[in-house]
Regions:
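Helix-loop junctions at membrane interfaces in 12-TM secondary transporters
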Residues: 96-115, 313-325
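Structural signature of the two symmetry-related core transmembrane helices
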Residues: 78-96, 296-311, 390
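Intracellular juxtamembrane helix-capping segments at the cytosolic ends
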Residues: 124-139, 334-347
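Juxtamembrane intracellular "pre-TM" segments in multi-pass secondary transporters
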Residues: 1-8, 204-237
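Helix-loop boundary and gating motifs at the non-cytosolic
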Residues: 1-61, 66, 70, 77, ...
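Transmembrane alpha-helix termini and helix-breaking/packing motifs in multi-pass membrane transporters
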Residues: 35-40, 68-72, 95-104, 159-181, ...
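Loop-to-transmembrane helix entry/capping segments in MFS-fold secondary transporters
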Residues: 45-46, 141-150, 264-265, 349-359
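Helix-to-loop junctions at the C-terminal end of transmembrane segments
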Residues: 62-78, 170, 280-293, 377-378
């Protein structure tokens, strides 16, 4: 490792950020606990889908604007620190709202949860641009795959701890107080991760673009870039459709609830199993990515999504649902590493914020696939839900075979 990149201290801080952030956010995991919280307060399957989409994809509306502003920044740390503080407050607010209003005003509680999730996710729209640019500056391409695999390994370990913590709180306190405690405790845990990444050693960017006069001009140039770059188009199509697993994922837990007894221990087991799958898979993803096999990583990850959703058709025991979440845990991490590394390898340094913003904006529309899932489940049934999910995942797998290693 040289003096300007791949510093061990930055490597450790990147890992700590992922570790503590995962412990915190897994408390409201959109595929397990969040649907149960919304369901407890009387929310419909449509609202479950909306909140899951809000938590995962509420940031997309500001991504391009964040990139427009960030084009001339030589340092991103001052800006990402503000994002961290806002996200902490939003998560803490959700917990306090559940405790204050949960028993007496379920509708007000749902509104506060939605507001908190919106602020938490909206602020991440700025943070994602800053974070990826910092990662590209402090780690070389090959070491980047290694550090992100380590990050995801320890993030999964944090998820294991989070599952145990969630099970303990859910079993120790009655609802809805237990839900509020989950958010309050986890907000302080994730704050440790924010502090870790806020102190990385960020070098100045040596190449920046001249900022356009207006945001409208920036949008025009950005989409002209998208039209001219065929490899970017293939990447975006592949990873957008790969998010089709979200059509079904938030509702698998509700399907399971009709077939098995989902007490706090069972819920914690599913969360833990997903994190074990993620943690163990990173041995494979780190090895593949470190050797530059990001295309193969994408191929395998999307195939795992297909296996998981196909299993949901026939699952009827806790063990089968644990298998589903185990497979999905691995697939999510593999897909994240492949998409992140491929876009950073493709983007020129001076255009990196624009490439990142285009990727996140377009792919993040897939985060709203859970809305489609809520609609399908509301008007049809689980078989229709799973079938449409599989069709879209097979299309994603086809496009992933056309990716180029960079």
């Amino acid at each position: 490792m040289n003096n300007s990149m791949d510093k061990f201290s930055n490597h450790v801080r990147n890992i700590l950020h992922g570790f503590f952030l995962t412990i915190g956010t897994t408390i409201a995991e959109p595929s397990t606990i969040l649907p149960l919280i919304v369901n407890y307060f009387g929310g419909s399957s449509l609202l479950v889908g909306f909140f899951a989409a809000l938590l995962r994809g509420g940031a997309i509306v500001v991504q391009l604007f964040a990139a427009f502003q960030a084009q001339t920044y030589t340092y991103m740390l001052p800006y990402i620190r503000r994002v961290f503080f806002i996200r902490f407050l939003a998560w803490f607010f959700i917990g306090v709202s559940i405790i204050l209003f949960g028993k007496e005003s379920p509708k007000l509680t749902l509104f506060c949860i939605g507001l908190g999730l919106f602020i938490f996710s909206f602020s991440a729209g700025f943070g994602a641009i800053y974070f990826k640019d910092i990662i590209a500056k402090i780690f070389s391409p090959k070491f980047r795959g290694k550090t992100m695999a380590y990050r995801q390994f320890f993030s999964a370990l944090g998820g294991l701890m989070s599952g145990a913590l969630a099970a303990f709180i859910l079993e120790s306190f009655p609802a809805p107080q237990s839900y509020g405690y989950l958010f309050i405790v986890s907000s302080f845990i994730m704050a440790f991760g924010y502090l870790a990444f806020a102190t990385v050693d960020e070098p100045a960017k040596t190449q920046t673009m001249k900022k356009e006069n207006t945001f409208k001009e920036f949008l025009h140039n950005s989409f002209a870039l998208l039209k001219s770059d065929r490899e970017l188009q293939i990447q975006l199509t592949t990873f957008l459709l790969a998010y089709a697993y979200l059509i079904s994922l938030p509702f698998i837990i509700l399907d399971a609830k009709t077939k098995i007894d989902l007490d706090g221990i069972a819920i914690g087991s599913l969360i833990t199993t997903q994190m074990v799958g993620a943690m163990l898979s990173n041995f494979l993803w780190g090895r593949l990515s470190g050797r530059g096999y990001n295309k193969l990583t994408a191929n395998i990850s999307i195939s795992l999504y297909i296996v998981a959703i196909a299993t949901a058709f026939i699952a009827s025991t806790l063990q089968e649902y644990m298998f589903i979440f185990f497979i999905i845990g691995g697939a999510i991490d593999g897909n994240r590493i492949a998409s992140g590394n491929l876009i950073l390898a493709l983007a020129p340094q001076e255009k990196r914020p624009v490439y990142i913003a285009l990727q996140i904006n377009i792919i993040s529309f897939g985060l709203f696939f859970s809305l489609l899932g809520g609609f399908l489940l509301h008007f049809f049934n689980y078989n229709v839900l799973y079938t449409i999910t599989l069709v879209m995942l097979f299309i994603s797998l086809y496009f992933s075979t056309k990716l180029k290693e960079l």
